[in-house]
Amino acid sequence: MTAVFADTFYWIAFINPLDKHAQAAQRFDDVLSSGKVYTTEEVLAEVLAFFAKDGWLRTRAVATVRELLSDPAVHIIPQSHESFSSGFELYAGRPDKEYSLVDCISMQTMRREG
């Protein structure tokens, strides 16, 4: 079984049919149906924040997150002080990169989950 990590970039393209990467996200979703998808609560929070100002897309984002929460093929890793601290340390230690804090939390989560 294939295991993949779905980040904010993917979910934004998946939710917004007008996103320039929407078609690629839909094609990738077909591949994901045969595997296990991992994401984090931090990623989902970032996605919801991204769509906060557009009523129609906000509604789509809420519906998508609700579906993910009940989908047994999607493993949503909960937020924790440990995930924040680990991501924060990577963020603080890499001033040469333009990683967001959520990117750093995601990278640390992928390392931890294998």
Predicted regions and their residues:
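Short, well-structured N-terminal submotif of metal-dependent ribonuclease cores
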Residues: 1-39, 53-65
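Acidic active-site catalytic centers that drive phospho-/nucleotidyl reactions
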Residues: 7, 46, 103
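Amphipathic alpha-helical segments within well-ordered protein domains
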Residues: 9, 48-49, 88
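Glycine/charged-rich beta-loop-alpha catalytic/anionic-binding loops adjacent to active sites
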Residues: 28-29, 66-69, 85-93
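Short loop->beta-strand "edge-of-pocket" segments that line small-molecule binding or catalytic clefts
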Residues: 36-38, 72-75
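Short glycine/serine- and small hydrophobic-enriched flexible loop segments
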Residues: 49-52, 111
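Active-site neighborhoods of divalent-metal-dependent phosphate/nucleic-acid chemistry enzymes
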Residues: 75-114
